[in-house]
Design a protein with these regions (language model features):
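Glycine-rich beta-strand-centered segment in the early N-terminal region that forms part
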Residues: 1-13, 28-82
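Short cysteine clusters
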Residues: 16
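Short, glycine/acidic-enriched capping/hinge loops at junctions between secondary-structure elements
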Residues: 19-22, 89
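Short Gly/aromatic-enriched secondary-structure transition segments
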Residues: 21-29
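NAD(P)H dinucleotide-binding glycine-rich loop of Rossmann-like/cofactor-binding domains
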Residues: 41-53, 79-109
Length: 109
């Protein structure tokens, strides 16, 4: 993990209506992300996303410049946004990995 980030292992992840909507209508969703400034213009409608934003995860490793308030092995959940990436949605924005992957990154808050 980079500075300020936490590497977590996905333990469980729900299937949300948003996941289904992105799967079926990615072009519309990405248009909204572009309009809101959540996705760079160079990322097109065919960008791949690793979905999963309603999750329970386990802390695996901390990056530099983190407070490490919770011990490695703690179970966590979070608001699925990365403040370090202008509010990019975990598991909904291209360039972020969601909890359908085995491991993914979160910002330490």
């Amino acid at each position: 993990p980079a500075a300020g980030q936490v590497l977590v292992r996905s333990l469980a992840c729900g299937i949300c209506g948003s996941d289904l909507h992105i799967t079926r209508h990615a072009d519309e969703v990405f248009d909204v992300f572009h309009q809101l400034g959540l996705m760079p213009d160079e990322v097109g409608e065919h960008a791949q996303v690793m979905l999963g934003h309603e999750f329970c995860a386990e802390i695996v490793e901390y990056g530099a410049d983190t407070q490490q308030t919770l011990p490695v092995g703690s179970r966590v959940t979070s608001v699925p946004m990365l403040l370090s990436q202008n509010g990019a949605g975990v598991g909904v924005t291209p360039g972020t990995y969601g909890a359908y992957s085995e491991y993914f990154l979160l910002d330490e808050a």
